[in-house]
Regions:
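Extended, hydrophobic/aromatic-rich amphipathic alpha-helical segments that build helical scaffolds
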Residues: 1-24, 56, 115-144, 167-176
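Long mid-to-C-terminal scaffolding/interaction modules that assemble large complexes
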Residues: 131, 208-210
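Short, low-complexity, Pro/Ser/Thr/Gly-rich segments in the mature regions of secreted, periplasmic
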Residues: 224-242
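Secretory-pathway/luminal and periplasmic proteins that interact with or process carbohydrate-rich
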Residues: 9-10, 27-34, 152-156
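A cross-kingdom marker of C-terminal helix-rich interaction/assembly modules
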Residues: 142, 147-149, 222, 229
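Non-catalytic C-terminal accessory modules of carbohydrate-active enzymes
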Residues: 203-207
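Hydrophobic-face positions in mid-chain alpha helices that act as interaction patches
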Residues: 18-121, 167, 177, 182, ...
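Conserved catalytic neighborhood of penicillin-recognizing serine enzymes
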Residues: 149-176, 180
Length: 242
């Protein structure tokens, strides 16, 4: 049901997305992970077998290495822009990454955890977004506050003044809650495919790469190995990158 909710949300079939999310949320087998009482430490992770909101894990973390304990270097660090989205009272701020800005949501060793999950909080986020587009943005904010109650120490409740404000707050909460879980690319496609700019440094030289608004490059190419196995498949048309 959660995958179906995600799929229909991506297709902008909002009533179906809501209905499938309802089925997940109404299943009393799962509960949102309460970070107030979780007792997580620097040696434990949000994605763990005792997390009551996780329904299914997949994709071994060996494919998703964040960093190795034998090294002081991380594959990537949490950006200042992401960090700025979290208030000081937000318990996710000390749960989703460590003091060195290394992602800390799941284990970085290939023997301890899976790297991807289906979990209850996504159902709330999917339903909240669908509710905004169904004209029920006040109910969407209620769903967001249900998540925030389990994540934030004080003053967890937010409000919205209109539909647009509610949608922005739903998307912001989605970015907070699902960071590092491979949702962002699909979310950006659904949010109008905005322009992206990234500066990369290599050997002292800096180069800025720009993904224009609405670019065909928002669709990733079909891997060469797949195309070689099935000659009928035609690759995605993408502009040349400079």
């Amino acid at each position: 049901y959660l995958f179906a909710s995600r799929l229909h949300l991506y297709k902008k079939e909002y009533q179906s997305a809501k209905n499938y999310a309802d089925s997940v949320i109404n299943n009393e087998r799962y509960q949102l992970y309460d970070l107030h009482t979780a007792g997580l430490t620097s040696y434990s992770y949000f994605i763990n077998k005792n997390n009551p909101e996780i329904m299914f894990c997949y994709g071994m973390v060996s494919f998703d290495f964040i960093y190795n304990y034998s090294s002081t270097y991380a594959t990537y660090l949490v950006s200042d822009k992401i960090i700025s989205l979290f208030s000081n009272d937000d318990l996710r701020k000390t749960t989703f990454w460590d003091k060195n800005k290394k992602p800390h949501k799941f284990s970085s060793t290939n023997s301890q955890s899976y790297g991807n999950t289906y979990r209850l909080s996504e159902a709330y986020l999917n339903r909240a977004e669908a509710l905004v587009f169904l004209g029920k943005w006040e109910s969407a904010i209620t769903d967001i506050n249900t998540i925030r109650e389990k994540r934030i120490k004080n003053d967890y409740e937010i409000t919205a003044t209109n539909r647009e404000d509610a949608l922005n707050k739903v998307w912001e909460e989605r970015r907070r809650e699902l960071c590092f879980e491979k949702h962002r690319w699909f979310d950006l496609r659904r949010q109008g495919m905005p322009e992206l700019r990234h500066i990369f440094t290599n050997g002292g030289s800096r180069k800025e790469y720009i993904l224009p608004t609405g670019s065909k490059s928002y669709t990733l190419p079909i891997p060469k190995k797949i195309r070689e196995q099935n000659k009928i498949i035609v690759n995605i048309e993408r502009p040349e990158q400079q």
